[in-house]
Amino acid sequence: MLKMVIIAYNEAIDMEVMEMMEKCDLKNYTKVMGVFGRGETSGTHLGNDIWPGRNNLLYVATPENTAKQLASAVKELRAKLGKEGIKAFILPIEEIT
């Protein structure tokens, strides 16, 4: 079964996230850059003077076992980088057209 892994992360760690993707041998993804958000650990990122910084999103469609490996890699990166902020959300894919 295919899963959609959505990874939300601080744009400051983009290089580390892309290295993580490479180590997981994941070459196909969709990246959305410069999104705004608020996280419990990393705080608010609205791209302005009061709340500087932005987030990026990666959408990765992958088999379930690879999605679990990617989630583990995200947890490891979060433990390493701390407050910079990264989270993974795993959703089922019903259909690809």
Descriptions of predicted regions:
Residues M1-T97:
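Positively charged, small/polar-rich N-terminal and surface patches that mediate targeting and assembly
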